[in-house]
Amino acid sequence: MLPPIRCFSCGKPLGHLWEEFNERVNKGEDPKKVLDDLGLERYCCRRTLLSAVVVFPVIAKFKKV
């Protein structure tokens, strides 16, 4: 799956927040604090970023048949 571009529920654009969210969480920062700092208040938008799993780099390693 590619990083989320919009919230699946309300449609709010989230793509511009993905890189900062992902970098800060990977550095060990608390996801709740990161989401609060990014200004995401709606639980649907928070869920979209929290549950996103980017598997494209893994899939890209396989050769076409």
UniProtKB/Swiss-Prot annotation:
Give Gene Ontology CC terms.
Answer: cytoplasm; DNA-directed RNA polymerase complex
Pfam family, any one: RNA_pol_N
E.C. numbers: 2.7.7.6
List residues binding Zn(2+): 7, 10, 44-45
Cofactor or coenzyme needed: Zn(2+)
Where the protein is mainly located, per its record?
cytoplasm
Q: What InterPro entries does this protein map onto?
A: RNA_pol_su_RPB10 (IPR023580), RNA_pol_suN_Zn-BS (IPR020789), RPABC5/Rpb10 (IPR000268)
Note the superkingdom of the native organism.
Archaea
Where does it live in the cell?
Answer: Cytoplasm
| Top-level enzyme category | transferase
Q: What detail does the entry give on cofactor binding?
A: Binds 1 zinc ion.
* One GO term of the biological process aspect: DNA-templated transcription
GO MF annotations in UniProt: DNA binding; DNA-directed RNA polymerase activity; zinc ion binding
What's in the keyword line of the UniProt record? Cytoplasm, DNA-directed RNA polymerase, Metal-binding, Nucleotidyltransferase, Transcription, Transferase, Zinc
Q: Which family does it belong to?
A: Belongs to the archaeal Rpo10/eukaryotic RPB10 RNA polymerase subunit family.
Give the protein's biological function. DNA-dependent RNA polymerase (RNAP) catalyzes the transcription of DNA into RNA using the four ribonucleoside triphosphates as substrates.
| HAMAP family recorded | RNApol_arch_Rpo10
Please give the name of this protein.
Answer: DNA-directed RNA polymerase subunit Rpo10
